[in-house]
Structures are given as C-alpha cells and as structure tokens.
C-alpha cells in the first residue's frame, strides 16, 4: 500500500494536500489507493513509502528565503541526512524550491544573490544526484507531490486526472489571491471565513479582521490586515483588483464596471441591473451580460460551502451560475479561524459541514537502519 508521509510542521502545504488527496479519493479507480499521513519526520519534509519499512522517495521543500538562510547558517548540510537515508534505503531524493521562476540573477533573497542559490541547486543535481523541482507556491508544491506519489505507485503511472476543472473554492481562493500579499494559504482561510460582500459592506469590524490567524496560529501580516480594512472602507483600487479575480472579468473590465460606482452599489442591486451595464469597446458598446453578472454576484457572495447575501444575515444555498466550473464545493474551515459573520444556527451548521478529508492515524514505524 503506497502512502505519502508529511512532516507535521508543513503547515502551509498540508491543507492543499488534504484537498488534493480528497479529489483523488473521488476517482473510482484511485479511491482506495491515495493515503496521506501526518507525522514528525527527522529527515526531509515528505516521504513516499510503499510500506512502513520501504521508503521510495524523500522530499525536502524550501522557499527561496529558506534556501538562502540554509546557505548562510549551515542548514544546507541537512542534505547529509538525506544522503545517508539514500544509502540505507536506496530511495530517490528530491528538493522542491518554491518561489517565482527565474528572478534576476543579481536579485538579493535574504541577503543572498539568486545566482548563488542557482549554483547551490546545480550542485545538488550534479554532485549529489538529487532531483530539483521548482514550484510557484504552496498549492503548486502540493500538486507536484501528488504527481510524484502517483508516479511511484505502480498502478498510477501517467494517470491523467478525470477532471481538470477548478472547484468553486479554488476559484474563490484565486479571487482573494489577486490582492498583493495574499498567498494561497491566506486566500483559502479568507474564502472559508468571509465573503467579499461582507467585507465591502463593512460588516466585518476591524477588530474581527485583527483576529484572523494562519493554520499555524500566527496573526495575518499587518500589510494584509491594513488592506482588508481599506477594502471595507471602500478603496476603489483594491475593489477593482478583487473584482478582476472573478472568472472572465479581468482588470480592464473590472475598472470599467466600477468607473462610476463602488462595488457595494452593484452587490445591493439585482443581477439584472449589473447585467445591463454598458461596457465601452473600441468600436461599439456592449452589455456586461447575465452570465458575467451572475458570476460576479455568486463569487463575491461565496463563503465556504454557502452563498452569503449582503441584505440578509442568513446563509442560503445558491444555485451555480451557468459557467464551465465544477459543481462540487469543498470547504475546509481552518481550526485556528472561526467564521466572522453572524448566521442562523441551521445555516451555520450547514455551511461548516465538512466534506471530509481522509487522513490515516495509525502509527507507522519507518525502519531506516
């Protein structure tokens, strides 16, 4: 039985892994073959195992900043632990380097030139025969881990997922992430904590925003808090960025929509009113249209597995707008964060009902001796 072991300190990636493995469980072919265990690891951040005593791969994940820091303080020598593990188990070794691809070689990252980081990565490949994989962010690292997991599983080599269509939650996370400084992890927390409609309507007091925490129970960055408070006070520039995160909108169209009115004005209007907005093009003027209007209302009122309307404190189920998007909603409420809007008891319990992420809890003994 193949399974992936994640170190319990990988707080930023584990939520995405749970979601990705949950998706795999819904594939009838893969239903009983994807397993995730969260434990304390002393070598690497992730292990791909065929059995409790058979390690196939050891993966270390580092951001550019982590990598630069390890070069300065000697933690780069942790690779010796990985090399020793390979000698004992004959496993493959992988380094995930997380961050924007191909920065300027002279760019300083944690006071270390990017060129020096590239040199260290090259040494890992040439000298130590480690695979180096570059990823964009935590969500991308999770996707690569799942791909590796199934590549090692003999039944799952070269299997293409049954559906590549993003879920509503993923689209809502992308919407929040359109704001500078909001990562995938913070975007996921916001998507399952409040709706954009509640934020722009001023229903989230600044003291509630100040209570938001990451999965590791750390406060949100001050920059993010200031930005959320600014949106609640009607910052037009930030409203345009948020609106541009709605599927099929974009920055130019968002700016045109909000040219004469604030975002809250349209959220308080019927969908038909938004659909009739005149959009100026080079040679003609067109209407925004019902599909885009429905998408705007749907995603700006989206919170967890429920649809939150501005004119009501109750959460009501919403029908999906007519778009090429998956209908399945996966809502994972981080343990360190509670919903910030008031809802009725019935609606609240319905909105927070988990879809279920399966994680093995049985003890595992990794024999590397």
Swiss-Prot record:
InterPro entries on file: ERCC4_domain, Mus81, Restrct_endonuc-II-like
Lyase in keyword set: no
Induction section of the entry: Expressed in the late phase of the viral replicative cycle.
Keyword Hydrolase: yes
Record region (Disordered): 339-369
One example GO MF annotation: crossover junction DNA endonuclease activity
Cellular component annotations (GO), alphabetically ordered: Holliday junction resolvase complex
Compositionally biased tracts (Polar residues): 354-369
Residue ranges occupied by any ERCC4 domain in the UniProt entry: 3-101
EC nos: 3.1.4.-
Name by which UniProt lists this protein: ERCC4 domain-containing protein EP364R
Organism, as annotated: African swine fever virus (isolate Tick/South Africa/Pretoriuskop Pr4/1996)
């Amino acid at each position: 039985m193949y399974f992936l072991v994640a170190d319990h300190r990988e707080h930023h990636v584990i939520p995405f892994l749970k979601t990705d493995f949950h998706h795999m469980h819904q594939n009838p072919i893969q239903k009983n073959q994807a397993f995730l265990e969260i434990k304390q690891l002393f070598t690497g951040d992730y292990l791909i195992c065929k059995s409790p005593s058979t390690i196939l791969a050891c993966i270390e994940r580092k951001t550019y900043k982590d990598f630069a820091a390890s070069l300065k303080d000697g933690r780069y020598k942790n690779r010796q632990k990985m090399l020793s593990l390979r000698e004992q188990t004959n496993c493959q070794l992988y380094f995930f380097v997380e961050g924007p691809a191909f920065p300027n070689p002279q760019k300083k990252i944690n006071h270390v030139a990017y060129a020096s980081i590239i040199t260290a990565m090259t040494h890992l490949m040439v000298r130590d025969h480690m695979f180096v994989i570059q990823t964009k962010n935590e969500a991308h690292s999770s996707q690569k881990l799942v791909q590796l997991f199934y590549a090692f599983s003999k039944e799952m080599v070269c299997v293409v997922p049954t559906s590549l269509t993003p879920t509503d939650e993923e689209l809502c996370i992308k919407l929040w992430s359109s704001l500078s400084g909001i990562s995938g992890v913070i975007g996921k927390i916001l998507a399952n904590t409040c709706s954009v409609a509640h934020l722009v309507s001023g229903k989230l007091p600044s003291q509630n925003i100040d209570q938001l925490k990451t999965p590791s129970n750390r406060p949100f960055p001050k920059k993010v808090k200031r930005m959320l408070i600014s949106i609640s006070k009607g910052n037009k520039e930030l409203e345009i960025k948020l609106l541009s995160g709605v599927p099929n909108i974009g920055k130019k169209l968002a700016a045109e929509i909000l040219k004469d009115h604030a975002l809250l004005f349209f959220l308080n209007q019927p969908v038909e009113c938004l659909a009739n907005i005149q959009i100026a093009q080079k040679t003609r003027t067109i209407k925004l249209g019902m599909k885009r209007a429905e998408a705007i209302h749907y995603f700006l009122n989206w919170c967890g597995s429920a649809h939150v309307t501005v004119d009501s404190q109750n959460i009501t189920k919403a029908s999906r707008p007519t778009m090429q998007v998956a209908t399945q909603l996966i809502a994972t409420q981080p343990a360190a964060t509670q919903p910030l809007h008031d809802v009725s008891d019935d609606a609240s319990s319905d909105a927070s009902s988990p879809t279920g992420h399966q994680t093995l809890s049985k003890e595992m003994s990794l024999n590397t001796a």
